[in-house]
C-alpha cells in the first residue's frame, strides 16, 4: 500500500465559487473526496492539505518524507510562478511529484507561463479542470507499480 499526498496551494479553498469560467464549478472538497475514494479502491492511502501559506506547504512536504509518503501531487497555484522555496523543499525530500493546474496556464497571462516546478516534476497536467487531479493520481499509481 502506497501513501500519496495531494497539496493544494493558495485560493484553491475557493474552488466552486472563484472564477468558475476559469477553474470550474467542482469544489475542493469534491476533488479530495474523489481522489480519496479512487486511492482507497486501488488499495492505497491518500492525504491532502490546502493552504494559503507557503510555509505550511513546505512544512507538510518536509513531514511527508518522515511519514514515508511515496508520491506527491501538487497544485502550487500562484506559488507556481514565485516559489523557489517550495521547489527546494520538493527537491530536498526526493519524493516524486506531478504538477497539476486546473486551467491551461499557457493560455493565460504571460506571467503564468513560467513554473518553478515543471522542470523537476515527473509530469505536468494543466487545462483539464478537476479531471487533471484524477489523471495525476492514475499516473502516480501506475508509476509506483514500476520496478
From Swiss-Prot:
Pathway: Metabolic intermediate biosynthesis; chorismate biosynthesis; chorismate from D-erythrose 4-phosphate and phosphoenolpyruvate: step 3/7. One of its GO terms (biological process) is chorismate biosynthetic process. The record marks 18 as: Transition state stabilizer. Pfam families: DHquinase_II. Substrate binds at residues 75, 81, 88, 102-103, 112. InterPro entries: DHquinase_II, DHquinase_II_CS, DHquinase_II_sf. Keywords: Amino-acid biosynthesis, Aromatic amino acid biosynthesis, Lyase. The active site is at 23 (proton acceptor), 101 (proton donor). It catalyses: 3-dehydroquinate = 3-dehydroshikimate + H2O. One of its GO terms (molecular function) is 3-dehydroquinate dehydratase activity. It comes from the Bacteria. Its EC number is 4.2.1.10. Homododecamer. Catalyzes a trans-dehydration via an enolate intermediate. Belongs to the type-II 3-dehydroquinase family. PANTHER family: CATABOLIC 3-DEHYDROQUINASE (PTHR21272:SF3). This is 3-dehydroquinate dehydratase 1. It comes from Pseudomonas aeruginosa (strain ATCC 15692 / DSM 22644 / CIP 104116 / JCM 14847 / LMG 12228 / 1C / PRS 101 / PAO1).
Amino acid at each position: 500500500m502506497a501513501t500519496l499526498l495531494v497539496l493544494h496551494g493558495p485560493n484553491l479553498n475557493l474552488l466552486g465559487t472563484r472564477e468558475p469560467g476559469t477553474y470550474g464549478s467542482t469544489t475542493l472538497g469534491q476533488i479530495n473526496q474523489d481522489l480519496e475514494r479512487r486511492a482507497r479502491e486501488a488499495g492505497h492511502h491518500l492525504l491532502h492539505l490546502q493552504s494559503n501559506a507557503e510555509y505550511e506547504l513546505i512544512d507538510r512536504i518536509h513531514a511527508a518524507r518522515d511519514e514515508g509518503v511515496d508520491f506527491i501531487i501538487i497544485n502550487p497555484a500562484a506559488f507556481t510562478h514565485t516559489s523557489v522555496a517550495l521547489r527546494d523543499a520538493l527537491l530536498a525530500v526526493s519524493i516524486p511529484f506531478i504538477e497539476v493546474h486546473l486551467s491551461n496556464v499557457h493560455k493565460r497571462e504571460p506571467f503564468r507561463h513560467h513554473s518553478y516546478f515543471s522542470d523537476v516534476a515527473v509530469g505536468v497536467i494543466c487545462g483539464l479542470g478537476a479531471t487533471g487531479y484524477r489523471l495525476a493520481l492514475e499516473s502516480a499509481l501506475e508509476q509506483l507499480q514500476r520496478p
